[in-house]
Regions:
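Catalytic Walker B motif of ABC-type/P-loop ATPase nucleotide-binding domains
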Residues: 124-127
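Helix-to-loop junction immediately C-terminal to a conserved catalytic motif
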Residues: 13
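A short, proline-enriched helix->beta-strand linker immediately N-terminal to the Walker B motif
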Residues: 118-122
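Conserved ABC ATPase "signature" region
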Residues: 29, 76-94
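Conserved ABC ATPase signature
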Residues: 99-103, 107
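Helix N-cap at the start of a conserved alpha-helix in ABC-type nucleotide-binding domains
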Residues: 135-137
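Helical segment within the ABC ATPase nucleotide-binding domain
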Residues: 139-152
């Protein structure tokens, strides 16, 4: 705690500018990108935030579909199908019309994860995925992360203080 893990993630994502050093992400030097190019780069990655980062005034489905509405020209039917599939993948079928306040902690994280993967990113970042979860829910989330990695064949970077989860999920630490 307090060792700079989340700060490092903010630097990698270009949310904060580095004072020294070099960060390359998907063959792009993050600190040298202008706003337009940084926006393009961020469309190629997904981020699952510690608290799910869902908008409280939107339903689960609206939250998950938001990146598609903002970044694609897909029709509404296709967007609904994609969000339904991601919800099924996250074991959240039937939660589409719920508000974030109606979800448990584990459900919030899975809904945030569904939104993080809706654009089918090349790279997925997790910020403290097990924070605030009981050991059983944390273990289920670890298994879900492994299933996603294998099913979607994507690279995943996890910021965590949970040593057990790190060793279970990681290929490299």
């Amino acid at each position: 705690s307090g060792s700079g893990k989340s700060t490092l993630l903010r630097y990698i994502l270009g949310l904060e500018k580095t004072k020294t050093g070099l960060i390359k992400l998907l063959d792009k030097e993050v600190s040298k990108l202008n706003k337009k190019d940084l926006y393009k780069l961020r469309k190629r990655i997904g981020v699952a935030f510690q608290n799910g980062a869902l908008f409280s005034s939107m339903t689960v489905r609206e939250n998950i579909e938001l990146p598609l509405h903002e970044n694609t020209e897909l029709d509404e039917k296709t967007i609904h199908i994609m969000s339904r599939l991601k919800l099924e993948l996250m074991q959240l079928s039937g939660t589409e019309s719920l508000m974030p306040s109606e979800l448990s902690g584990g459900m919030l994280k899975r809904a945030g994860l569904a939104r993080a993967i809706i654009m089918e990113p090349e790279l997925l970042f997790f910020d403290e995925p097990s924070a605030g979860l009981d050991p059983i829910t944390s273990a289920h989330l670890d298994n879900l992360i492994l299933q996603l990695r294998d099913a979607l064949n994507m690279s995943i970077i996890i910021v965590t203080h949970d040593i057990e989860s790190a060793f279970k999920i990681a290929d490299r630490i």
